[in-house]
Swiss-Prot record:
It catalyses: 4-CDP-2-C-methyl-D-erythritol 2-phosphate = 2-C-methyl-D-erythritol 2,4-cyclic diphosphate + CMP. Binds 1 divalent metal cation per subunit. Involved in the biosynthesis of isopentenyl diphosphate (IPP) and dimethylallyl diphosphate (DMAPP), two major building blocks of isoprenoid compounds. Catalyzes the conversion of 4-diphosphocytidyl-2-C-methyl-D-erythritol 2-phosphate (CDP-ME2P) to 2-C-methyl-D-erythritol 2,4-cyclodiphosphate (ME-CPP) with a corresponding release of cytidine 5-monophosphate (CMP). Homotrimer. Pfam families: YgbB. GO terms for molecular function: 2-C-methyl-D-erythritol 2,4-cyclodiphosphate synthase activity; metal ion binding. Pathway: Isoprenoid biosynthesis; isopentenyl diphosphate biosynthesis via DXP pathway; isopentenyl diphosphate from 1-deoxy-D-xylulose 5-phosphate: step 4/6. Belongs to the IspF family. This is 2-C-methyl-D-erythritol 2,4-cyclodiphosphate synthase. Its cofactor is a divalent metal cation. The record marks H35, T134 as: Transition state stabilizer.
Amino acid sequence: MMRIGHGYDVHQLVAERKLILGGVDIPHTLGLLGHSDADVLLHAICDAILGALGEGDIGKHFPDTDPAYKGISSIKLLHEVMRLAETKGYRLGNLDATIIAQRPKLAPFIGNMRENIAEACGTDVSRINVKATTTEQLGFEGRGEGISSHAVVLLNKAAHSEER
């Protein structure tokens, strides 16, 4: 059995915060505001996986009202989400994600993002695709006010597991 999930996240860009995308610290004058490290890419991926599992969203599993998640690395959250998928008998088939940001240019960091995501998901990097685009200066991303991300995942039921 295969299951598909879609995730979306957005965070505001602010001064005095690190810009972390796909678990990579990106040099930039602004960073993303959030309770955790505010990694919009990994948050969208977590939501996509949770959606495919029918398990709600990242806010349900890691609420921003819980001090345990204050400043937490989103790589840790992705590990936890994948652990849940595995307990339900699912493995990642493939993942396709898009980061929407006017700046900074993200192409030099995509390879490291893919490697981080593959490691967190326990899969080969060939199953992970990450791309970045701009909005041609339109909307909040185009004005440099924030960054958003979309992710789509395909989960495959492991051959030896039963539907739970």
